[in-house]
């Protein structure tokens, strides 16, 4: 059995494919797995590190502006897409995959299209509440389309090939809360706020925390992943203490989640999948410049479910936002309700279920 995963650019489009690949390796002895991506994406370094073959295509994303510069750049983008499509046909002929799985990002488009035109089975896995351009364009020709949010179903009418299976995410073993707090050197008698904005960080979130940090001292525990870009600036102003753990990156994310009563973060699909699988209540600050504003759509899905509240990026440093967070941390009953609502939105078996669908398609 051969499976080709096409997607990347960011971890949010790559790691769902990695999770499905890991599940396939568990249940299909001798399965041959390869990936396709771009030289500029995270997959260029991460996929070889994981030991999978990688095909690189020159495809780029379209500029969304209307300036002459953007229009001129898009001429080159279309040329690169044509070249990538020809390479994709060559990859399909050479690899002869049983199934091509698209996990989003512009790199998935030429591989999915070439596979569909070659008569190869295709599965699209859409992470975001508002489906991406590739998903919307190629869904009708796909063998199956799998969504992460139930509310995304409305974009596909009565299509019989569309299913809601959740977003494959990292799995974390359950650990006692006190043991997790001890790991970070924090007090057991205070509620804990976990804050992160991705591996590079989120400047608006970090700025808000810098403004409020002194007022949080002694009221809550804080686990704060600053990201690599802001680490030096933040640690120059604020240091760790008995109620604060501050660092550029959290290696033991399972322990951070285990300690957390509330999470403040962006609204990327992978983060939300982890939150809902673990049943964590959250305060979401969608990245305002995400393509098609997809993070806002993701956040709205959890807000509508009662699992989260949303704060606009521009309002993060307002006193009202601080009061909202402190009020939540002081209301254990509301946190419990939000946690139950969050868990009801999770799909902890998503990777295994999707691996099963890939296997079924390969045999059909």
UniProtKB/Swiss-Prot annotation:
UniProt keyword list: Cell cycle, Cell division, Cell inner membrane, Cell membrane, Cell shape, Cell wall biogenesis/degradation, Glycosyltransferase, Membrane, Peptidoglycan synthesis, Transferase
Membrane topology: Peripheral membrane protein
Cellular component annotations (GO), alphabetically ordered: plasma membrane
Residues that hold UDP-N-acetyl-alpha-D-glucosamine according to the record: 10-12, 128, 170, 199, 250, 295
Biological pathway: Cell wall biogenesis; peptidoglycan biosynthesis
Pfam families on file: Glyco_tran_28_C, Glyco_transf_28
Localization in the cell: Cell inner membrane
Function statement: Cell wall formation. Catalyzes the transfer of a GlcNAc subunit on undecaprenyl-pyrophosphoryl-MurNAc-pentapeptide (lipid intermediate I) to form undecaprenyl-pyrophosphoryl-MurNAc-(pentapeptide)GlcNAc (lipid intermediate II).
Family: Belongs to the glycosyltransferase 28 family. MurG subfamily.
PANTHER family reported in the protein's UniProt record: GLYCOSYLTRANSFERASE, UDP-N-ACETYLGLUCOSAMINE--N-ACETYLMURAMYL-(PENTAPEPTIDE) PYROPHOSPHORYL-UNDECAPRENOL N-ACETYLGLUCOSAMINE TRANSFERASE 1
Protein name in the entry: UDP-N-acetylglucosamine--N-acetylmuramyl-(pentapeptide) pyrophosphoryl-undecaprenol N-acetylglucosamine transferase
Organism: Chlorobaculum parvum (strain DSM 263 / NCIMB 8327)
